[in-house]
Regions:
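Short beta-strands and strand-coil junctions in structured, solvent-facing domains, enriched
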Residues: 54-55, 110-113, 188-190
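Short glycine-enriched loops at secondary-structure junctions
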Residues: 183-186
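Hydrophobic alpha-helical transmembrane segments of multi-pass membrane proteins
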Residues: 24-34, 151
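Amphipathic, interface-forming alpha-helical segments with heptad-repeat character
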Residues: 51, 70, 77-181
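Aromatic-capped interface at the extracytoplasmic side
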Residues: 7-12, 31-45
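Long, charge-rich amphipathic alpha-helical coiled-coil "stalk/tentacle" segments
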Residues: 190-200
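Membrane-cytosol interface motif
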Residues: 45-70
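Hydrophobic alpha-helical transmembrane segments
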Residues: 2-28
Length: 200
């Protein structure tokens, strides 16, 4: 095997260091240019860091030239929504209820979304469920007398309170809450029949 390698390379002359300089420079220059080129899709941004320091956020869609030797992390600025898990909580009167909500949100500050929390998507989900628990426990499920706000009778008010609380909790992650709606509300199965009979 070694004999074949020696025979194959015997006709190749040994280039001097001066002959390789233009090739090395061309390769280095090409690497720098390609490290600066980035394609940004609609609804996406690129958070740019230069050796660990935040430089800025590229928002213009299409082909862009950024600083070479930078790291670029994609952050979506599209509108997102998700439905919380169905939570079992006690209302203000101590009755166990099931409640869930739909949260519509969007990243407003890409730097905060990238650096303030580990995962802004997980953060939004956890904080939304925590806010939903808090709001659900501060109101009764129903108000038969009609004197106060209840989860069932004042859904717009409760949704507004929930939107405000979720927005306050996720602001640190650079997230803006666009809309919140209660998607599921019911007494827990173990007391649902008894509460239905009481209402009748």
């Amino acid at each position: 095997v070694w004999r074949i390698v020696v025979l194959a390379t015997s006709g190749v002359r040994n280039p001097s260091a001066g002959d390789l300089t233009p090739i090395v420079l061309a390769v280095v220059l090409a690497a720098l240019v390609f490290s600066a080129v980035v394609v940004i899709q609609p609804g996406q941004t690129k958070v740019v860091q230069f050796f660990g320091r935040y430089v800025g956020t590229a928002r213009r869609t299409g082909l862009s030239m950024l600083l070479p030797l930078t790291t670029k992390r994609g952050v979506s600025v599209r509108v997102n929504n998700f439905e919380t898990n169905v939570l079992k909580v006690n209302d203000a009167e101590g009755n166990p209820v099931e409640i869930a909500a739909i949260i519509v949100w969007q990243v407003a500050d890409t730097a905060k979304a990238s650096f303030a929390v580990e995962s802004y998507k997980d953060f939004v989900k956890v904080q939304s469920e925590a806010a939903l628990r808090h709001v659900a426990t501060s109101h009764p499920y129903d108000d038969p007398d009609g004197h106060g706000e209840s989860l069932r009778g004042s859904t717009d008010v409760v949704s507004g309170e929930l939107a405000t609380e979720v927005a306050e909790r996720v602001r640190v992650a650079g997230v803006e809450v666009l809309e919140v709606r209660i998607s599921h509300l019911a007494y827990s199965p173990e007391i649902a029949q008894a509460m239905l009979q009481r209402q009748q």
